[in-house]
């Protein structure tokens, strides 16, 4: 699986950036 990994990493890396 790779799509799920990208989705999780994207969200985790976007969460703190959207602060």
UniProtKB/Swiss-Prot annotation:
Pfam families: Leader_Erm. InterPro entries: 23S_rRNA_methylase_reg (IPR053643), Leader_Erm (IPR013204). The keyword Manganese does not apply. It comes from the Bacteria. The keyword Ribosomal protein does not apply. GO terms for biological process: response to antibiotic. Disulfide bonds: none annotated. Keywords: Antibiotic resistance, Leader peptide, Plasmid. This peptide is involved in the control mechanism of the synthesis of the erythromycin resistance protein. This is 23S rRNA methylase leader peptide. It comes from Staphylococcus aureus. The gene is ermC.
């Amino acid at each position: 699986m790779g799509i799920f990994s990208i989705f999780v990493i994207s969200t985790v890396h976007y969460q703190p950036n959207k602060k």
